[in-house]
Amino acid sequence: MSKNHEVYKDALPISLAYPLPPIILTNPLTWIPYIYRYLFRKTPRQVQWQCQLHESDLSCVVTDSEAIKKFWTSGFFGKGNLSRSEPTWHTRTKRSLGLLGFDEDLVAEEVTARRRFQRKQFKAQRAYRENRARERQLLLENGKPIPASLEEDAELPEYLTKSLKDFSRVSENPYHITSVPNVEHLQLTFPEAFFLASLGVLRINYENPNFELLPILKLFANIVANSVALTHDYSLQQSHEDPIIEPDNKFLTELAAYFYFRQQGWVVKNGTKFSVDFLLYKKGPVFSHAEFAILLIPCVGNKQKYNMQWHEVHCLNRVIAQVKKSLILCYVQCPSIEDFNKIWKNQASMNEWDWAESVLRQYLIRCVTLRRWVPSRNRD
């Protein structure tokens, strides 16, 4: 088993059972702890981590280092606020100050940067040799002598043989910093936070004590409905009354799709970088690039609030095709307003999670794969 498969072996941050100790058939002494652990197994105690709700950026913040590591290595939940994906700011900062060795505890961004540098250097060396070969051929055709610098076994210039380490000299540390506090935190989207809370591994803390009285599903839907960034109605921001929650509420449609793809075994990440709602990874960002880009299209009955024009679909599909992904149009069929209001107002008579399940069961997911037709590749 490779190192990555060992570190990221858990699909979810929950412990179902303690692993059995190793057993050697030729050594009877190893049978005793194995049999004891097998017969007297105990259910592991689930740890409930804490996070803080941030209404302004529609996210939940996790600051505990153990929780950050657990959520990332067991399902790739959230992203570092100072990193592209995995929270690696602390390691990168320590290396830039000379507190870590050049090859010590490499993170994904650094490995990627080194591979890009090696490819760039290889192409530069290849182009240099090709130019020298052409010059050598011209001299031979004109009957002129070939200088030593154009010989096939001539050494490459110094700037083409330098390694990344030569260009990555650690700058001086004028303040003699010996330790760097980790100020990075993990940001969870509302669907991720709700999913983890439903598993019982996350507790959401609120600055507003009134939020404690609301179920998480209703609270997140209210916050999204009141969001100025989504509604562009600044008067709602000042309202203290519960907003009108519609079946195609952005949080509810995203949550229904998030649960659907998580149940299919996909690792679901935010897709804002590629102008879509979600990206689907087979195992996770550490192992491979995303295979599919998901664009959510909420539908209430036979109507859609926003119909994309064909030129918009083609532009988006071309962008997705350029990054070697497949675009999936995910139609989220929402319940009718009457059916939705009937279940939504039934919250007081049900358990929080049973009520949330009854709400999500009203949503139906249909996926359509859209691929760009290329004549040179689709002749048959």
From Swiss-Prot:
GO terms for cellular component: cytoplasm; tRNA-intron endonuclease complex. The active site is at Y281, H289, K325. Transmembrane segments: none annotated. InterPro entries: tRNA_endonuc-like_dom_sf, tRNA_intron_Endo_cat-like_sf, tRNA_intron_Endonuc_cat-like, tRNA_splic, tRNA_splic_SEN2. It catalyses: pretRNA = a 3'-half-tRNA molecule with a 5'-OH end + a 5'-half-tRNA molecule with a 2',3'-cyclic phosphate end + an intron with a 2',3'-cyclic phosphate and a 5'-hydroxyl terminus. Its EC number is 4.6.1.16. Keywords: Lyase, tRNA processing. One of its GO terms (biological process) is tRNA-type intron splice site recognition and cleavage. Gene3D superfamilies: 3.40.1350.10. It is an enzyme of class 4 (lyase). Pfam families: tRNA_int_endo. GO terms for molecular function: lyase activity; nucleic acid binding; tRNA-intron endonuclease activity. Constitutes one of the two catalytic subunit of the tRNA-splicing endonuclease complex, a complex responsible for identification and cleavage of the splice sites in pre-tRNA. It cleaves pre-tRNA at the 5'- and 3'-splice sites to release the intron. The products are an intron and two tRNA half-molecules bearing 2',3'-cyclic phosphate and 5'-OH termini. There are no conserved sequences at the splice sites, but the intron is invariably located at the same site in the gene, placing the splice sites an invariant distance from the constant structural features of the tRNA body. Heterotetramer composed of sen2, sen15, sen34 and sen54. Interacts directly with sen54. Belongs to the tRNA-intron endonuclease family. This is Probable tRNA-splicing endonuclease subunit sen2. It comes from Schizosaccharomyces pombe (strain 972 / ATCC 24843). The lineage of its organism: Eukaryota, Fungi, Dikarya, Ascomycota, Taphrinomycotina. The gene is sen2.
